[in-house]
Amino acid sequence: MPIPALVAAPLLAVALAAVVTFATPALLRWLPVPPDEGEVAPFVTLATPTFRAAVFACSAVAGGIAFACLPPAHWPAWVGLVSVGVLLGLVDLRTTFLPLRLTYLAVALAALGVAVSAWLRADAWVLVSAAVAGTLGAGFFWLVWRVSRGFAFGDVRLAGLIGIVVGTEGRAFAFAAFFLGTLVGALWALAVRRRKAADEPFPYGPALLLGPLVALLVTRLLLPG
């Protein structure tokens, strides 16, 4: 990676993390309480200093990994995932909910970023690849949800978001991202189930979101070329 990009990558990651952290209270206030879940505290109650520090740290690390591993023309496609997507994962971790509005915001940012990335790369097939991966990712998780009910429907929508982003890096990378995210989720679920009841809700979203980042580290840093 050229020296200017090496400097810009961490700066952009920190800047995005600062923006999403600053916006966290307003975004959480914007989210309605799930209507069919009984007594659930408003999402804005999550916006404690500790939670916001976690948002900043996780977003900065996620952005740093993505931008360090990829050429600058690829960065826009990842902006939504490493900012609002990270907030979405932390909300899921704390509440086991993946709020619809926040998911759609992340999808909108990802779609816009993919369009910008395709333009910067002068490659319209980036749009096609992102659309196909998003559809296949959501479709596969919908099928699993339909058959087993092993996770909530919010994870189906999240898979679509992830597919849109990882699809810009090609079929092999998209497969690796979903495989690694599913593997992390399975191992995490096994560890959690040892301490909790089998029917207790499990936050699968954070594991899915880790998949693309682990795939980047493995394919770009540990296995270059």
PLM regions: where:
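A membrane-topology feature that recognizes alpha-helical transmembrane segments
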Residues: 1-225
